[in-house]
Every structure is written in structure tokens, then in C-alpha cells.
Amino acid sequence: MTFRTLRRRRFPAALALTAVLLIVPAASHAGAAAPGAGYSEVPRKVCPIDWRDGTFHVKKLIRCAAARWTVPGGASKALAIANRESNFHPRAYNSYSGAAGIYQHLRHYWPGRARAYGFRGWSAFNARANIMVTMRMVHRGGWGPWGG
């Protein structure tokens, strides 16, 4: 296969992914702050750090969440894993496995995890949701393959 053929095949997929990424973040906040939300809802006042301000702020959010939910290995382990999984890029995506976000949640598990840990309807590409869900999961079950 030539480079030109590969480029022609990947362009429509890249265009579609770009369109989805532009639409999803706007819609991903819809159910997050609804009044009367369930007990698992994470209030915005918990680690009120705007991750969109760059990698420094993503790391700061990870440190805050790791301290809030006391994860095994603390913030240093949480940072090392995020660095390995996505290099702290909220939009990281593995097209082979479908893993997305800072901590690379598989797309078919993300909706259930997000719902269970207070981020119903949020995108895995939202760093706040991805980090908070991960820290709560790790607090409950430790680091390791989650498998569902």
C-alpha cells in the first residue's frame, strides 16, 4: 500500500473523528450538574481546577483528585500512569483498542463507569471526568486491569 492510498483512507476517518470531538465536549456537560443528582455526583467544588489551561493544570487536577480519594501509591503513581497512558493529553485516543482520554478508558466501559462515579453523559475526552472517575475507581479497587 502506498502512502497516498493510506492517506486517502485515513482522511475520512480523521474528518469524522474531528467532527465528533467538536460536538461531544459541548454535549458532555449536559447531565453533570443537574440538581437532585445522585449521591455519586462529584460537585464542581471538589478540585476546582480548569484542566483546559494546559498540562500543568491536568497534573494539578490529578494531584488534587489522588489526594482527595487517597489512591494507592498517591499522586506520584497516578501521575506516572497518566504519563504512560496518554502523556497527559485529554484527547489521546487509541484507534486499535478504542481507549480514550487521560487514563485510556475503553469506549464500551466508559459510559457505565462515568455513570457509576458521578459523570453520567460526560465524554472520556473530558480530563476532569476521566481523572475523577479513575481516582474513584482506584480508591475502591486499586490499580490494575479493571476489565469492566
What are these regions (language model features)?
Residues 86-93, 143-145:
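Secretory-pathway/luminal and periplasmic proteins that interact with or process carbohydrate-rich
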Residues 31-88:
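Export/targeting segments at the very N-terminus of extracytoplasmic proteins
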Residues 58-65, 74-78, 102, 106-109, ...:
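Stable alpha-helical elements in mature extracytoplasmic
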Residues 119-129:
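A short, structured beta-strand-centered segment in the mid-to-C-terminal lobe
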Residues 1-49:
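N-terminal prepro-regions of secreted/extracellular proteins
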Residues 41, 145-148:
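Catalytic cores of secreted/periplasmic lytic hydrolases that degrade extracellular macromolecules
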Residues 96-116:
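Substrate-binding/active-site groove segments that recognize
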Residues 69, 90-92, 139:
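Functional surface patches built around histidine and acidic residues
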